[in-house]
Amino acid sequence: MATKQSVTTREGDRIAIVAGLRTPFAKMATYFHGVPAVDLGKMVVNELLVRHGVQKEWVDQVVYGQVVQMPEAPNIAREIVLGTGMNVHTDAYSVSRACATSFQSTVNIAESMMAGTVQVGIAGGADSTSVSPIGVSKNLARALVDLQKTKTLGQKLNIFKRLSLRDLAPVPPAVAEYSTGLSMGQTAEQMAKTHQISREEQDKLAHRSHSLAAESWEAGKLSSEVMTAYAEPYKAALERDNNVRFDSKLEGYAKLRPVFDKKYGSVTAANATPLTDGASAVLMMTESRAKELGYTPLGYIKSYAFAAIDVWEDMLMGPSYATPIALDRAGMTLNDLTLIEMHEAFAAQTLANVKMFASDKFAKEKLGRDKATGEIDMDKFNVMGSSIAYGHPFAATGTRMITQMLNELNRRGGGSGLLTACAAGGLGAAMIVETE
């Protein structure tokens, strides 16, 4: 068992999530087409500061993340500081932990507070799959470097003669793991087959996610945590996530064909998250600083954990490894939790993790534990839907989940919630938050 964790400052202050906000999430090449992640990040952070009356000189540190990196803005956090009018001396750095990026940025702010160097911070993440770095072939890249060393026209022509027409074609961002060559979708297919997750089960989970997300939007639950976005050419606003199916019908999911294993597969575009654009952020303070400034926190971080596993098989099983560590560090069991949200990269991955949470065999063979983490009560699980419905701008999902969980716990009268996510590279994240 992991040692119990104390997420407090040296003076005993808890680490507070004071507020959270996100843009609506939009499918790739729709509303935010042409809007880079740095602009999405500036948009949401500026609105967060204005909406909650935060004087910009209060902010000691910004930690922000991005997965689809743009070479022209490698430190998105610093660009957000400079682009929102914060004090130029505000410390800012960027992080990347694939789909768990904004869990990492939140933890980094928390750990700075625990160390006593920060009292007010902003964490979050943004991604745009609509504005991606388009590369060139290795041969062309090498030729362009060599051209800089040439002096004569003849030398330049000799370099160009080495190139074929294929070398001149643009190279889109890779969708496969660098270490294995496998895509996330291929891993989801492997997990579906290995853990016997049927197509029907996957479609049912996707339908459930869309239905609960639609209900949450219609009930007004998300209106306070999702800003209205205005993007160029400013002809229309976006107020809601445009991936949510407000008319979801289970029978419609069966019509789609598998994407990653066309003959024997079960993972489709409907039971997986789409490529998405969006940004999110949370305002964090030490408990005493929040009280001093007159803020009532949404809640507090109780524990957190990260895990890393093999990438060749079950690469998206990170939640099953990280969660028991976070529970131990909180001194809790799965049954103690009020709510649970697990990031839905794919329905297959989500359901495989749900199975492993309840598996004594998995606990003994993979975790070295005597018994399973526990069987998830589905009445507590992803009660507002999750990423299959809302979408998944990679770096923005973690702080989307934190804000959404704390607001829902407060609506229910308080309690504790588990947030957990898989991530590329065989990574996993888990965080337990609590409200008064």
Swiss-Prot record:
| Primary location class | cytoplasm
Q: Give the catalytic activity.
A: an acyl-CoA + acetyl-CoA = a 3-oxoacyl-CoA + CoA
One GO biological process term is: fatty acid beta-oxidation
GO terms assigned for molecular function: acetyl-CoA C-acyltransferase activity
Q: Which UniProt keywords apply?
A: Acyltransferase, Cytoplasm, Fatty acid metabolism, Lipid degradation, Lipid metabolism, Transferase
Which family does the similarity line name? Belongs to the thiolase-like superfamily. Thiolase family.
Q: What functional role does this protein have? A: Catalyzes the final step of fatty acid oxidation in which acetyl-CoA is released and the CoA ester of a fatty acid two carbons shorter is formed.
Q: What is this protein called?
A: 3-ketoacyl-CoA thiolase
Q: What is the lineage of its organism?
A: Bacteria, Pseudomonadati, Pseudomonadota, Gammaproteobacteria, Alteromonadales
Q: Gene name on record? A: fadI
